[in-house]
């Protein structure tokens, strides 16, 4: 599978075209809208989320609630475009209109794509950069991820994300009896945290940052249960599933680090305390005593839950802006202020779920793929039976 997105933050709409989704997948707009609504929630979001109520329109590739096997096109309208029609319109402006335009950006914000993108593409108005580099684009990435999640769910695979740290406040209680319990608890938490006490402290940290005109980041974790053994590859570096997952997490706006399983903690332990001992029983076949590898070894799945974490830096748009330089006058100035969140970590956990789900669904279709969901399901069932008795 593959997809491409298009659209600007304050343009008319966001669009994604998805290719390679098998025929026969049950899919309706509500499957996607539920994920879009989850992305818009979360403590610390800005005023933009009060304007937009994201709803998807499926314009191709689905008929009567089932995928056809042809490309799926999804559209999400930007309601805020009504206030930006002149500034973000496709038609040229008159000389007078250009002079009157008050939204030209010449003061790059530290931490954003503004300056680098303007230099790369030769834009004197950095709005041309920030409109596309905005995290608003993750709306349609979540939409694509919702389709991937639906593929996984049909194959008995569950994806759940949660927040384990915000602004230095770390969740202490991260145990759960089932992945469904994990989902239930985090959906009820304003910061998507399993630890209620830590969640309250996270809310306070967000409030403190907002009152100071600042922003804070954090760490999210995605857990996936139900993946078969041996998905991915050790044969080529670019087909290793852990490499693809790491790239997917790092592709999310403002993410600066990723780890799988115990991750960087492995540097502090001897090998005897890192590697997962292999067990076998008649009911389940091969399993592991521990899951320090996070469900991935040698670029392939082990059959244990996949555990991926990502580090999100504080959002660089600040209400007490940092020092910058005006690209027209070269004079020092405080950077431009754009409407923004004070913390987007809870929402980012939903985006992380989406990109992880996409990579796993793609890997499954590559390995077991045919053009129909029922045949893919049969292939996976045969593979699981084979692996149990191997």
From Swiss-Prot:
**Reactions catalysed, as given in the entry:** 5-O-(1-carboxyvinyl)-3-phosphoshikimate = chorismate + phosphate
Which InterPro entries does the UniProt record give? Chorismate_synth, Chorismate_synth_AroC_sf, Chorismate_synthase_CS
Q: Which GO terms describe its molecular function?
A: chorismate synthase activity; FMN binding
List ligand-binding residues for NADP(+).
Answer: 39, 45
Q: In which pathway does it act?
A: Metabolic intermediate biosynthesis; chorismate biosynthesis; chorismate from D-erythrose 4-phosphate and phosphoenolpyruvate: step 7/7
Top enzyme class, one word, equals lyase
Q: How does it assemble?
A: Homotetramer.
PANTHER family from the UniProt entry: CHORISMATE SYNTHASE
What's the protein called, per UniProt?
Chorismate synthase 2
